[in-house]
């Protein structure tokens, strides 16, 4: 492919509105352009990468018997009313009317559509299982689109749905998908973890998220690629190294989610779902009597603890939530933080939000800062974190402004439902007892759910089982964020390329180091002087030879300065660069391996053989 024929609008500078490196490089390297807020055009390079990823997916899904189809993006609202999600999905749902004033939506996901198609066509367990998927644009009216392709209003997604006559059959397909996802992301060159996830708006029960890890840019050996003009990092002057570190740190670490994972086992979970090892403790101290004490101007746990000279771990944090229009009191040990996802899941609530100051006063008779679990109205629902039951003679709010109660003992002074509703902390023991928890940022690239009968129940999708009984179809759901794969790969494979000029100056610039499976082309073939006929002829021969051996070749045939050509090549990030330069008449070309910065000169006749050796090594 001739570069002069492609739309690759590279920029000399990073875009000023980009906060994460993947967004900046996709724009600067000419992969994407923003058409409107949260809406992007995928230019030829991006489209080629996405198509390569689609090929990987299709190959792996064929192995597990998944069949591709295509559903409409424009959906009737009636289907979503059947499932109940038309009213509950929220403001992210694009709603519109046609000329007949009928309600439609732009699909953010397609559970209802696939359920309806199968409901109308499948009547017996003998017709199951079915394993269907599509690759299609989705739509979500994000309030604040950001970070390039990571949070957009239109995005490309692979969504799959499986249909079964029982849960045992679903378990088999779920495991097939889990293994297929691992194979897909491994082939794509991603550093990822499969973690325990939250079913969220999909209504799933068991679920697993696949997160592309976005580590901090502190490891110079990982993020910096040295040109052959620099022997090692030790040769770079200290002041230049400090500049490089500052440049690496200047870009925000992307990833919407925090992952908690064990240092010594396979345990990994989204922070929203992560738990830690818990060991109940026996009470050894005698229980004191309740005593009300004045705590003037103390509104926070640390202020109360300091005023009463107690540790924060001896205090009870009392919070009030409204769950599906019902008040729920949540209790934590004072130095812990609430995990609202755990609380919402435990309550099986559709809606959960913190109560207002006015609602707190109506319920407790006091404002925030003085709330507590003692002497609440009969029938009040109290959900306490499991650590609270270990407390003896704790401090809690007195439900009276400016006062607290000491000597509070769970069981004696209040009754509660005990469950894990706290946010874990880094360094705590893993729940399996092996290793401690560490945190990392991650980009969600895939998610699989066991939906069960959530949609078949609400939409009447039933079959006759082997005993002739009418039973709901059991479902699974499997998603991959196709467009955000591009962002995730660039986040992990962006590199700062450093070289030394003949004058001894050090220069550095960002570029992409694409893994071979997803690179838009395999080889960047550059002619230094397009007016040199010998070089042109050699380039044409090499292009033909490479293509005959199955290489995708991008040939830079532009009449541009060689510096511009090399800069664009570093930005675009193809794995191999072959330069036809001053030694073209001698039949000598230069090969450069992007991942390492290594380069060698070879006879053009030996190019293919040399590339085969080098690509095996790297």
UniProtKB/Swiss-Prot annotation:
Compartments reported by the entry: Cytoplasm
InterPro entries for the chain: aa-tRNA-synt_IIb (IPR002314), aa-tRNA-synth_II (IPR006195), aa-tRNA-synth_II/BPL/LPL (IPR045864), Anticodon-bd (IPR004154), Anticodon-bd_dom_sf (IPR036621), Pro-tRNA-ligase_IIa (IPR002316), Pro-tRNA-synth_IIa_bac-type (IPR004500), Pro-tRNA-Synthase_IIa_type1 (IPR023717)
Domain of life per record: Bacteria
GO cellular component, one term: cytosol
Annotated Gene3D superfamilies: Anticodon-binding domain, Bira Bifunctional Protein, Domain 2, YbaK/aminoacyl-tRNA synthetase-associated domain
Main location: cytoplasm
Family matches, as SUPFAM superfamilies: Class II aaRS ABD-related, Class II aaRS and biotin synthetases, YbaK/ProRS associated domain
MF annotations from Gene Ontology: aminoacyl-tRNA deacylase activity; ATP binding; catalytic activity, acting on a protein; proline-tRNA ligase activity; transferase activity
First-level EC class: ligase
Its EC number(s): 6.1.1.15
Keyword Lyase assigned: no
Pfam family, one: HGTP_anticodon
Keyword annotations from UniProtKB, A to Z: Aminoacyl-tRNA synthetase, ATP-binding, Cytoplasm, Ligase, Nucleotide-binding, Protein biosynthesis
HAMAP family assigned: Pro_tRNA_synth_type1
Similarity remark: Belongs to the class-II aminoacyl-tRNA synthetase family. ProS type 1 subfamily.
Matching PANTHER family: MITOCHONDRIAL RIBOSOME PROTEIN L39/PROLYL-TRNA LIGASE FAMILY MEMBER (PTHR42753), PROLINE--TRNA LIGASE (PTHR42753:SF2)
Role: Catalyzes the attachment of proline to tRNA(Pro) in a two-step reaction: proline is first activated by ATP to form Pro-AMP and then transferred to the acceptor end of tRNA(Pro). As ProRS can inadvertently accommodate and process non-cognate amino acids such as alanine and cysteine, to avoid such errors it has two additional distinct editing activities against alanine. One activity is designated as 'pretransfer' editing and involves the tRNA(Pro)-independent hydrolysis of activated Ala-AMP.
Swiss-Prot/TrEMBL domain comment: Consists of three domains: the N-terminal catalytic domain, the editing domain and the C-terminal anticodon-binding domain.
Name assigned to this protein: Proline--tRNA ligase
Species for this entry: Streptococcus pyogenes serotype M49 (strain NZ131)
């Amino acid at each position: 492919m001739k570069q002069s024929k492609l739309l690759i609008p590279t920029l000399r500078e990073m875009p000023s509105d980009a906060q994460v490196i993947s967004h900046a490089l996709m724009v600067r390297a000419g992969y994407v352009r923003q058409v409107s807020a949260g809406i992007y055009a995928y230019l030829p390079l991006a489209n080629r990468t996405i198509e390569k990823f689609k090929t990987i997916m299709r190959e792996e899904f064929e192995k597990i018997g998944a069949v591709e189809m295509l559903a409409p993006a424009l959906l009737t609202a009636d289907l979503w009313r059947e499932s109940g999600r038309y009213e509950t999905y929220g403001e992210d749902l694009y709603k519109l009317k046609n000329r007949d004033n009928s309600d439609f939506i732009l699909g953010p996901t397609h559970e209802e559509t696939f359920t309806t198609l199968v409901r109308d066509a499948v009547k017996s367990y003998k017709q199951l299982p079915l394993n269907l998927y599509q690759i299609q644009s989705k739509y979500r009216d994000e309030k604040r689109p950001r970070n390039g392709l990571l949070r957009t209003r239109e995005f490309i997604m692979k969504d799959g749905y499986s249909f079964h006559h029982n849960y045992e059959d679903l378990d088999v397909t779920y495991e097939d998908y889990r293994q297929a996802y691992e194979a897909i992301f491994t082939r794509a060159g991603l550093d990822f973890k499969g973690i325990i996830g939250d079913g969220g708006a999909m209504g799933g029960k068991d679920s697993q998220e696949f997160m592309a890890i976005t580590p901090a840019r502190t490891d110079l050996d990982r993020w910096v690629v040295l040109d052959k003009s620099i022997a090692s990092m030790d040769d770079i002057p200290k002041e230049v190294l400090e500049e490089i570190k500052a440049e690496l740190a200047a870009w925000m670490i992307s990833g919407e989610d925090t992952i908690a994972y064990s240092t010594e086992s396979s345990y990994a979970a989204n922070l929203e779902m992560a738990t830690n090892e818990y060991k109940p403790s026996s009470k050894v101290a005698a229980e004191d009597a309740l005593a009300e004490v004045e705590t003037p101007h103390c509104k926070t746990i640390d202020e109360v603890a300091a005023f009463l000279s107690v540790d924060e771990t001896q205090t009870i944090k009392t919070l009030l939530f409204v769950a599906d229009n019902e008040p729920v009191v949540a209790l934590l040990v004072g130095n812990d933080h609430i995990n609202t996802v755990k609380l919402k899941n435990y309550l099986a609530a559709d809606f959960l939000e913190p109560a207002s100051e006015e609602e707190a006063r109506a319920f407790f008779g006091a404002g925030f800062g003085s709330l507590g679990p003692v002497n609440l109205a009969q029938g009040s629902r109290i959900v306490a974190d499991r650590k609270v039951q270990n407390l003896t003679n704790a401090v809690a709010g007195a439900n009276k402004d400016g006062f607290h109660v000491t000597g509070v003992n769970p069981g004696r002074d209040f009754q509660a439902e005990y469950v894990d509703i706290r946010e874990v902390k880094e360094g705590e023991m893993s729940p399996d007892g092996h290793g401690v928890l560490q945190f990392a940022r991650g980009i969600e690239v895939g998610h699989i759910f066991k939906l069960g009968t959530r949609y078949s129940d609400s939409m009447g999708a039933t079959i006759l089982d082997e005993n002739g009984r009418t039973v709901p179809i059991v479902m699974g759901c499997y998603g991959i964020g196709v467009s955000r794969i591009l962002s995730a790969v660039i986040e992990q494979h962006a590199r700062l390329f450093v070289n030394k000029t003949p004058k001894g100056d050090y220069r550095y610039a960002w570029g992409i180091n694409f893994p071979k499976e997803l690179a838009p082309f395999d080889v960047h073939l550059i002619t230094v002087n397009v007016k040199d006929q010998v070089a042109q002829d050699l380039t044409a021969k090499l292009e033909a030879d490479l293509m005959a051996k199955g290489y995708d070749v991008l040939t830079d045939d532009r009449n541009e300065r060689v510096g511009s050509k090399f800069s664009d090549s570093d930005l675009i990030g193809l794995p191999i660069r072959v330069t036809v330069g001053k030694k073209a008449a001698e039949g000598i070309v230069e090969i450069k391996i992007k991942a390492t910065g290594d380069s060698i000169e070879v006879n053009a006749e030996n190019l293919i053989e040399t590339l085969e050796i080098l690509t095996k090594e790297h």
